[in-house]
Amino acid sequence: MRTVADIIEIHGASADADLQPKFAAAGAAYPPASITFIALKQEKIFEVWAPGDNTPVLVATYPILAASGGPGPKLREGDRQVPEGLYRLAGLNPNSSFHLSIKINYPNEFDLRHAAAEGRTSPGSDIFIHGREASIGCLAMGDPAIEKLFVLVARTGYENVEVIMAPYDFRKMPPQPAGGPVWLPELYAAVADRMKNFTN
């Protein structure tokens, strides 16, 4: 069984060599005190933001190679949907069957509250940012990208990472929650409000 320390020993130097210049060019410290990931499902873009002098700065973007499902939040186990909302990380998995993975804290308190209110007893679980190029409800980033992201999260501390997951970029087009659950406008408004802080 591999440990996080094993992964740092294997991939740390190459990841640092790639990430340090990106952070320096953006005007951010490396490793940062905190980071924000923004995952855009429609655009299949994964943004990495870090604290700058006064405002967050965009450090890097990676393509999302696979994300199953379509627009709309994850509601139940097996629906193949990628979650939407404001999340934190729950840990790092150095022994993933998808090379390496980073666990998202889905379902969070918001998800659990609405699942309980609607009688959904199995809202799903085990949502990861991972390697490889296939996904069922997770974000598949490919192996080279997940090696860098894994090292970045390990160096930053997974408890210092925020994850914003949206159907598309609310900074460019306002939320259109028609046709979803009754609580979807509330969720999208919160996501859009948080995303406003991350603009170049």
Summary of predicted features, one role per range:
Residues 42-43, 63-69, 166-171:
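Acidic helix-start/capping segments at beta-turn-to-alpha-helix junctions
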Residues 18-36, 48-49, 64-78, 82-89, ...:
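N-terminal post-signal-peptidase region of extra-cytosolic proteins
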Residues 43-47, 53-56:
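Primarily extracytoplasmic ectodomains and periplasmic/lumenal surface modules that are beta-strand-rich
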Residues 1-23, 200:
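N-terminal secretory targeting signals
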Residues 78-200:
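Exported/periplasmic cell-wall-interacting domains
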Residues 39-43, 105-107:
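Short, flexible beta-strand-to-coil junctions
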Residues 58-60:
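Residue-level detector of beta-propeller blades
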